[in-house]
Design a protein with these regions (language model features):
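Extracytoplasmic
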Residues: 641-843
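Structured mid-domain segments that build the active-site/substrate or prosthetic-cofactor binding neighborhood
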Residues: 220, 225-228, 234, 377-383, ...
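Contiguous, structured surface segment used for ligand recognition
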Residues: 24-177
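C-terminal non-catalytic alpha-helical accessory regions
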Residues: 158-163, 476-629, 704, 713-715
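Bacterial Sec-dependent N-terminal signal peptides
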Residues: 1-28
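An acidic-aromatic substrate-binding cleft motif
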Residues: 152-205, 210-230, 398-401, 661-664
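The substrate-binding groove and active-site-proximal loops of carbohydrate-active enzymes
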Residues: 127-130, 191-208, 225-234, 272-287, ...
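Gly/Pro-rich turn-and-neighbor structural signature
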Residues: 166, 231-232, 238-249, 273-397, ...
Length: 843
């Protein structure tokens, strides 16, 4: 964000603005004094050209409501060009075009730009001008945000603080163009929560235009511009013809999911399988071509992105007979239909081909794709980028996209109930993607939309300007976002709590949590429970300190997910205690059984409050997801069930020291580190950075930027292990001189497809031992169940090596790690001198 051509009058108010939540260079709205009072006489007139885009009208009317929320002033849309506020799009607003012609505003800032706005004061009029319709819309919503209206005012009930006066300061304000061209969300896995809420709210069995209008407004307020609509049981295009019209009018680019080609929803086929015939292009080409043609005919004249290609029926893999030749024929035929229906070259209609699961194999095997088609890469459903385009592939004219998940249905187990994505993970992986040329389209699977408020905002903000966020500023984003929702005075504490709940929840999803997740023996279970209890207490303390108007928003965004996961951890901890004590014949097992049952009931009480009491029952049905009782990957069980219980009848350079034969070293507690040497024409190599909150324990250490070489880099740790204690711990076995070293790192995939990534481990200056940690971390049949699923679900790779530990006089040793590839994130090192006995602590 920047202010250009600042006038003297604006400088006079800089001292005032610097005390506000955003820097003086970022803000143009004030509530105490400024150059232009926009709500004088309690009336605000907003002018827009009647010939301007329909989406600008939607946003202008939203601004009318926002001004009323903030100040109580009466705002109206007027035909008076001397109105207090002028909004318009170049080429669609005569007033804006005239100001450019008169050089009252700099047209060069907008002409030829994409989705860019400028906000400036001309004489005594606030002017919001856009390079195109969405540029104008974003400018309008920028004013709303600076007035204090959160994009989440509706979807998270964030209150709007009252101000009697709204001032703006002279200058020209803009936030440039978006880095990623298409930025959107995918409503997915929407049953039972979103579907129940929609039925309770609108009385429909599907999402109609009333529902989608609210979603579209949120997307635009967040500076998104596209959507994949919900598609499990809904058909966006067929259920309500107003859906498509509303999207196009408001300025949202519609598309369909990775397995719904040619602007058709899967349900349009599924509801009439008998009529359409098998979803098999080899056997049913004519009918499927007709199905595809109808989709293109229906979307003609609207701004959409056409998904091309095919997957199997219902998001399954295609038949074994499918091959690259067949897929090539399908895409060629689809493009012929697009050209025929639109009367334009196929290349003039935006298209995307999703390289999802087995479809990526077709591309990797050399399938040729038209140069104008955007190639959509996908994460592994757990937030790990599978691959990035190489230097040659980045020349692809259609560009590259990314399909990213914070919600997932599938093996090893669903992840639907809560946001379990640590704040730092999307930032790190989206940075990886963007730095490797993935910048045409980003789409985020958000499940039911709620409770994914923060990851949606984070994703959209990064898509607009990923270079704004680095290792030093990612936590600042969380803080500023919390200031927007809960006020400046609450931002630091709210951000700390939000960071921690996302971090904690990322350790294990509620669906995968059970009595065996952590160890009772080494105290890990108790430690995790204590962390949640402390966090819950901190959140409740802040909740109670807030004005009542903020309670519902705070509960939705922060308190509810903490209460849910704290309670679930306590419940499974109680079950683990019950089961262990029962085996010992200890009657205290009954006490823990009672506690587990109490906590199971409390789970439903927490959800009931969310559904029926919070926000006056506004969110009835939104928290009805089953999450206790999983036996396999899916929630194919009738209702939540209490865990199995048993009862007994009534008849500093730091030197890390060992503890009980084990040394635990957090990655940031290094003795020394060496950055990478410059490679080729580089002025400097990659540097070690600490990623706060990254991983399962304290933080992560890695080399950045990822695009620079890592040769010559190393990081060294010191530890002290008493040889006698070690020998005693191992009972003088044959392995008494050996220790097991666990190097715990983030579960990064082999995104360069080079046969695995490696690092070296050296003890006391010995020759490094080379460790290839992810050569088999893939979905090949021989790896998927035993290696891939367990690893990505826990988000770490724990590689163990055995080394001979030489005797030293003081017991102090060094351990040096030398990464040989970028994007290796070290989280923790554990040296186990107990002869392989016992489980080491990961957290």
């Amino acid at each position: 964000m920047r202010l250009n051509n600042i006038k003297k009058a604006f400088l006079a108010s800089a001292a005032l603005l610097s005390a506000m939540s955003m820097s003086a260079a970022e803000r143009f709205v004030s509530f105490k004094q400024g150059d232009l009072l926009i709500n004088g006489n309690d009336k605000v007139e907003i002018y827009m050209d009647a010939n301007d885009c329909r989406g600008v009208s939607y946003a202008a009317n939203a601004l009318v409501r926002d001004i009323s929320k903030v100040s109580g002033s009466q705002a109206t849309i007027t035909s008076n060009q001397k109105a207090t506020i002028l909004v318009g799009t170049i080429g669609h607003s005569a007033a804006i075009d005239q100001l450019i012609k008169q050089k009252r505003i700099n047209g060069n800032l907008l002409k030829g730009k994409r989705e860019k706005f400028i906000i400036t004061v001309v004489d005594n009029q606030l002017v919001i001008a856009g390079s195109d319709r969405r540029g104008t819309i974003y400018g309008i919503y920028e004013l709303s945000q600076q007035m204090g209206v959160s994009p989440w005012y509706d979807w998270a009930d964030v209150p709007v603080e009252h101000h009697d006066s709204i001032f703006v300061n002279r200058g020209t304000y803009s936030d440039g163009e978006p880095a990623v061209r298409y930025r959107g969300i995918f409503l997915n896995d929407e049953a039972p929560c979103l579907t129940s809420w929609v039925k309770n709210t609108y009385g429909t069995e599907y999402g109609d235009h009333r529902f989608y209008q609210r979603v579209f407004e949120l997307v635009l307020r967040l500076r998104g511009n596209m959507m994949w609509p919900a598609m499990w049981g809904w058909a966006f295009y067929a259920d309500d013809a107003e859906n498509e019209k509303t999207a196009d009018e408001m300025g949202v680019v519609m598309s369909t999911s990775h397995h719904e080609p040619m602007a058709r929803n899967h349900q349009e086929y599924a509801r009439n399988r008998k009529g359409w015939g098998p979803w098999n292009y080899q056997k049913n080409k004519a009918n499927l071509q007709k199905f595809f043609r109808e989709g293109i005919e229906r979307m003609k004249g609207t701004e959409q992105i056409v998904t091309i290609g095919m997957r199997g029926d219902g998001d399954e893999a295609m038949s074994e007979e499918a091959d690259t030749r067949l897929m090539t024929n399908i895409i060629n035929d689809q493009r012929k239909i697009i050209a025929d229906v639109t009367g334009k070259k196929a290349s003039e209609t935006p298209q995307v081909w999703a390289l999802y699961k087995e479809v990526q194999d077709y591309y990797d095997k050399g399938m040729k794709v038209p140069d104008d088609v955007t190639l959509l890469l996908c994460d592994d459903n757990w937030g790990n980028v599978r691959r990035v385009p190489n230097a040659q592939e980045r020349k692809h004219k259609g560009g590259w996209g990314l399909y990213y998940h914070v919600d997932y249905v599938g093996a090893p187990r669903n992840s639907k109930m809560l946001n379990v994505t640590p704040v730092q993970n999307p930032w790190e992986q989206l940075t990886l993607a963007y730095e490797n040329g993935i910048d045409r389209l980003w789409i985020l699977n958000v499940g039911d939309l709620k409770p994914m408020e923060y990851p949606i905002s984070q994703f959209m903000d990064m898509a607009w300007n990923p270079r704004k966020y680095d290792v030093n500023s990612i936590t600042r984003h969380t803080r500023d976002w919390c200031a927007q929702q809960f006020g400046e005075s609450q931002a630091d504490e709210a951000a700390r709590i939000l960071n921690l709940v996302c971090k904690y929840n990322g350790r294990c999803t509620p669906e995968m949590l059970d009595k065996n997740t952590y160890s009772l023996e080494n105290g890990e279970w108790q430690e995790v429970v204590n962390q949640y209890l402390q966090l819950e207490a901190d959140a409740l303390r802040q909740y109670n300190s807030l004005p009542a108007a903020y309670h519902d928003a705070y509960r939705q965004i922060i308190l509810f997910p903490i209460e849910m996961m704290s309670n679930l951890h306590q419940m499974y901890f109680a079950q683990a205690q019950n089961n262990a004590l029962y085996k010992q014949g200890n009657p205290k097992a009954n006490v823990w059984a009672d506690e587990c049952e109490r906590l199971f009931k409390r789970d439903s009480i927490i959800c009931d409050y969310y559904n029926h009491k919070m926000s006056g029952g506004k969110w009835n049905g939104m928290m009805t997801q089953k999450h206790i009782g999983y036996k396999s990957w899916n929630d194919a069980f009738e209702k939540d069930t209490c865990p199995e219980l048993f009862r007994i009848s009534a008849s500093e350079t730091p030197v890390i020291a060992e503890h009980n034969g084990v040394v635990e070293i957090e990655a940031p507690f290094f003795a020394s580190k060496t950055d990478a040497a410059p490679q080729g024409k580089e002025k400097e190599g990659a540097k070690w950075v600490q990623i706060p909150f990254m991983g399962k324990s304290l933080a992560g250490m890695t080399l950045m930027p990822y695009t620079k070489g890592v040769k010559g880099a190393s990081i060294t740790y010191q530890f002290k292990m008493n040889a006698l204690a070690r020998n005693a711990a191992s009972s003088n076995n044959a392995d008494s001189k050996k220790v097991r070293i666990h190097v715990i790192i983030k579960s990064t995939l082999d995104y360069q497809n080079k046969g695995g990534m490696t690092y070296g481990v050296s003890v006391d200056g010995a020759e490094p031992i080379l460790v290839n940690f992810n050569h088999n971390l893939n979905e090949k049949p021989e790896n998927i169940y035993d290696i891939y699923y367990p690893t990505v679900a826990t988000r770490i790779i724990d590689k163990v090596i055995e080394v001979e530990l030489p005797a030293t006089g003081d017991g102090i040793h060094t351990l040096t790690l030398t990464p040989n590839d970028p994007a290796i994130i070290f989280e923790k090192i554990v040296i186990d001198g107990r002869g392989g006995k016992g489980r080491v602590k990961i957290i």
